[in-house]
Structure formats: structure tokens, C-alpha cells
Amino acid sequence: MHSDDPQQLELLRVCRIGRAQGLKGEVTVQIFTDEPEYRFAPGAVLYTKDGEEEYVVESSRTFKNRWIIKFEGIDDRDASEAANGVVLYGEADDPEEMLEADEWYPKDLISLEARLAEGNTLGLAPGTVVGKVVDVIEVAQWLLKIRLANPVKDADGVVVENSALVPFVDELVPDIDLEGGYLTLDPPGGLIPGL
């Protein structure tokens, strides 16, 4: 994987190797991907952050909501214990293919302008700038943190609300235009302060 080419593929964090599982080299992993079936398919290649070491998936399985992976060359408990704590990365998908498939990474949404959607339920002018996406928070459901273009102030002019959390679902975020640098929102009343 190591390359002196400055245009080498971007690596995304996929997992952290955890405890040894059994005696034959299997390990548990803490996952950081929403595509574990793809990332842990037999033959999939993962890398250390510097791209110097490759870890090839030999087999994978789930047990009680945990992924258990067997990597090529890690064949006993000693080798699996030695790998504990190693963080592995995978190659990012091709950006052009992702755009065609209407897919994106959370980091791609940060800094997009948030505008009101056409025909929004609030009845406000479409295209009205609500703010800018400053973070994508992953809890039970992804949330977009939007810094408001017009912060809400109290009677004394002190800012009391300068951001809003919007669930990242199709109904509330109907359009994303990465090339145009914006996304549209169709929030219900009360979700975004000041609207």
C-alpha cells in the first residue's frame, strides 16, 4: 500500500483490534464503519494508519453483536494478543462513484450551507439560509449540528441559541448537493430555534 504518490487513496478508520478470541488467532474488533460486511469480507485488505502494514481478512463472523475476525498470518493466541490495540484503515470509496450513487461520508457534509427546502412545512421561502453544518454526530441516529445564520437572542440581545441538531433523515434533509455546497432542510416547527 505504501506509495510516494501524493494522490494515493484516502484511508478511513475501520476498526480497532481487541482481545484474542480463542486459540487460533481470531480477534474481536471495535468497529468504526457502517459497512462491516464489506470491510470484513474474506480477502478484504486493511492497513495500519501509515499504510505500511497490511492485514488481510481470512474469515469473519458475528457473535452476540460482536465481530470476530481472523487475519492471515495471525494464527495463534500469542499473535492475536500482540495485535491488540492496532487501529486498521480501509481505502475510501471512489468519490465519483459515490456521487452517482447518492452516497457520501459524514465528513463531506461538514461546511455545507443549510437552506430551506422547496415546499417546506414551515411555509417559509425556499432557499432561505438557515446556517452551516459544523459537525455530524453519530449516536443512535446521525445528527447534523448546524450553526445558525441568525442566532436567537434574548431581550437584552444576548445570544441564547446559536446551533441546532437536525436528525439526518430523508424527510428532514431531502437534498444534498456536494458540488453546489449545500443541503436542504424541511424541519417541523420548533426543531430549529428562530424558525
From Swiss-Prot:
Gene Ontology biological-process annotations: ribosomal small subunit biogenesis; rRNA processing
Residue ranges occupied by any PRC barrel domain in the UniProt entry: 101-191
InterPro entries: PRC_barrel-like_sf, PRC_RimM, RimM, RimM_N, RimM_N_sf, Transl_B-barrel_sf
Keyword vocabulary terms for this entry: Chaperone, Cytoplasm, Ribosome biogenesis, rRNA processing
GO molecular function ontology, one term from the record: ribosome binding
Cell location: Cytoplasm
One term under GO cellular component: cytoplasm
Record flagged with keyword rRNA processing: yes
Record-stated family: Belongs to the RimM family.
Subunit structure: Binds ribosomal protein uS19.
Known function: An accessory protein needed during the final step in the assembly of 30S ribosomal subunit, possibly for assembly of the head region. Essential for efficient processing of 16S rRNA. May be needed both before and after RbfA during the maturation of 16S rRNA. It has affinity for free ribosomal 30S subunits but not for 70S ribosomes.
HAMAP family: Ribosome_mat_RimM (MF_00014)
Free-text comment on this protein's domains from its UniProt entry: The PRC barrel domain binds ribosomal protein uS19.
UniProt name for this protein: Ribosome maturation factor RimM
Species of the source: Bifidobacterium adolescentis (strain ATCC 15703 / DSM 20083 / NCTC 11814 / E194a)
Gene name in the database record: rimM
